[in-house]
Amino acid sequence: MLRQCAPYAAQADASPNHPWIDLGLSQNQREEGRQRGDSPAMVEYNHTFARFLQEVLEQGCFCFHASALQVDGEAVLFSADSGTGKSTHAGLWEKYLADRHRVVRLNDDKPVLRVRQDGVWAYGSPWSGKHVIHTNAKAPVKAVVFLEQAPENRIRSVTSQEAFSLVFPQTFCLKTDARQRILVLQMLDQFLRQVPVYLLSCNISREAVELVYQTIWKGDYK
């Protein structure tokens, strides 16, 4: 994790805006992980993410299970259950758009989201899933797109009720921790008021990218 965190290193004194977080692992925590069959690297990853998550919630942010892609300065979040193809679909955007647009993957698995007065912003972080793709950058969120596999491509906007039922399960918090749950729910209320949510049924094709681009940016695929 130290290597993954290197791009985010900063010189700062401890303060409410720059709190110190103890990410150290105790011997008992290492042993518990070993007994579960986790590798030392996985134990470290899970422990540090849990501590990071706790702190970002207190700072008015939350982590979301998605591949966050920055396209010409705006972020689109591709979300789905693990194994559906978030990373694969994001890779199609890099393949088919990078020659004409600036395409950057902010985080391939757990972007940090903050609801601000000027909109919702997505941030990169070192905790980025098995592909370890992340960038120390931020972008305003243009849309959230939930993916499901299908032989043909189609997309539709979802109702507010549907949006909540899709988004909440993909947020990260200790669901048995009442305070964490309340913090996430409060932020989601504002998040869903500001960000459109779509459901994309798609295959692995250039046409799927074109459909989403045209829908979100309301323009021709160029």
What label would you give each PLM region?
Residues 86:
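Conserved lysine of the Walker
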Residues 89:
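Hydrophobic positions on the alpha1 helix immediately C-terminal to the Walker A/P-loop
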